[in-house]
Amino acid sequence: MIFYILFFFGIIKSQENYSYQKPPPEILELVDITLPPRVLIDENKNFMIYLYRNSYKSIDELSSPEIKLAGLRLNPNSNSRSRTNYYNNILISKMDQIDKSAKQIKGLPKNPKLANIKWSPDQTKIAMTNTKEEGVELWYIDLEKLTAKKLTGPKLNASLGDVITWYQDSKNILTKFKLKNSPDIIDGVDVVPTGPIISSNDGKKAQNRTYQDLLKNEVDEKNFETLARSVLSKVSLKGKTKLLAKKNLYHEIDFSPDGKFILISIIQKPFSYLVPYYRFPMKYAIYSSKGKELTVLHEVPLIEDLPKGFMAVRTGPRNFSWRSDRPSNLIFVEALDGGNPETDIKYRDEIFEVGYPFKQNKVSLLKTINRFYRIDWCNDTLALGYDYWWNSRNTKTYIFSPSNTNKEPKIIIDRNYQDRYNDPGSFVKRRNFYGKSILAMNKQNLYLMGDGFRDDGQFPFIDQLNLESLKKVRLYESSFKDKKEDLLDFEADNNMILTRIESASEYPNYFFRDLKTDSLTKITDFENPFLSIMDVSKEVIEYKRSDGIDLSATLYLPKGYDINKKQKLPMIMWAYPREFKDNKSASQITQNKNEFTFPYWGSPIYWLTRGYVVLDDVSFPIIGEGDNQPNDNFRKQLVDNASSAINRVYELGYIDKEKVAIGGHSYGAFMVANLLSHSKLFAAGIARSGAYNRTLTPFGFQSEERNYWEAPDTYYNMSPFMHAEKVKTPLLLIHGEEDNNSGTYPLQSERYFNALKGLGATTRLVMLPKESHSYRAKESIMHMLWEQDRWLERYVKNK
């Protein structure tokens, strides 16, 4: 009887049932706010669009019908993505008028759920979708008239790829529609099996990541076809609809710059149970603007067996796209190394151009030493090509002449893309006659906008690059030391910069900066909604690891903290490990103390209101120079990063060293579990949505491209699950029940919790219903904050 009572109460204690809870008022005040809108500005700076949405979804919204197919999550009732973020209001400001105040759009739907916002080519209109329970509607807004109009009923198919695409005339929209007589969705639970599910392999190596939400059986295949199949129709702004192309599994849709042709990708069979839909067989074809198929460019087979490595690609033509500075010239890439990164060859990729009829007389434009990345077009005599190689972190920029293939391309930038201090920036673009993005060139000059990270701070800049001498002249460099400036656009013709400026306590606002007069014109006036943390202390601290690597972090002290008395407070650290191939890049400071203090849903900043010191964005580099792999020395570097950070804040006199917590999300959660397994630095840990057993991700994870059988010791040593018996520190595990991130499926937290519990650790597992890898519902987020606060109060502050 005594055994029964103890057993019964053991079950009660181990399995608690709670309704959704709310965090303390100090935290709740920062969560329950309305954020300023997202801002869009047209190329000519005539219109500013304010897009409003709720800060969070509700658990009711998140509980809408959902079916998981081929890597997608779809709402079968509305035939759309089930986890889309929607806007609920739109305001417009006409920036070329005296009255620049934001005006309400007339005629918007009731209780709008707006998405797929698309500028028209002439940038006087925007198209969008409105999602209702029974389907998705097509709407558009006339920006001059400030009016919205519904063009179709709830007939669109918004499940896959491009849903709406403007015609070049800005008067018609190419739209995906549901089939009129589409089959009903099959409920697989009630289907009687006709046989086993069989997967086989003919001896080829097929090493794939642990993708989720894949097809599992024939019922899934049929449901995928039902929800993904659509017809293409032309919809005029008067609401007239004309069928353009018959039913198919249309994916991506892209008009040629002159609007005469359409590049379309179409998913084919056979489907796969191993990889998501975007690696299914795919047909690339050219259609006329009237919907006639003209040319099949290439039929890509099922991609299940790529060579090993992050730089592996398939063979055959890939990366089909239109050349943005020409009417209808098609670009594609082919691997010269068979797609295999281990092949030793001078050039990895070759880029080709082909014109109508798109099947003959292809012209080679460029060969890249690394894997092709993209091309920025300008004109017949100038384009910039980019490549990159993950293993060395190298990227190159090539200048070449598209019309003169005899002219040797020249490498003008050759750098480590993780080296932020020497980042030359990105080339400025502009819209051309076709409404496409091309390089902004003025009198043989191009322009670069850079973030401007240096060892003494962040100072964004604009450089002018002369194409003949390849010499640079600095046109502008931010001089702010008490604010953060982000350069968004530059018009060389009138020396005008569109910029965004913020400070730790000032919400980001948009400005025009006139370089001629060195003046600023404010164009938005958003206020800080987080008043309770407006006056907290914030600084970027610098310190060294035991091996001499320079580290940094953002340190926050609670409002009213007396810097002279230096009361020793509890601290919460939050971090995310990152891999580097050189010490120099790993040591660079990329935090900015003037960045606006924004407590997003997963932030530790909330605990400033609860009397904690917060150390956020803590440097956690994992370095492997030369032939050394970063992860082969993962644990030692991890502990060294953590102890160095704690010691620095302790030396400053702010914290009780015995009352420090560590937290992280995803790979940061993996970090937390490892630190609690291999150090005694912390009073408690919070690990959200992590992976803890690397044998369950045997073909690579994060930045590890070796498989388990190539590096078994590394996989074992890095897996907290294998060292669960060492955890003596209280650990709070939180996970979304519907996590679809590769490698972090909920089983990871469930099995790790069971191991910790079985070994006598102090631990708690919170599974959030309906949540994926990032949490969306307000109820879930509030409960998460409540759980974290209780954990910190019990095991850290009141230790």
Predicted regions located by residue number:
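Conserved hydrophobic/aromatic pocket- or pore-lining residues that grip, position, or stack substrates
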Residues: 284, 330, 412, 510, ...
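Beta-propeller folds
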Residues: 4, 14-518, 525-535, 550, ...
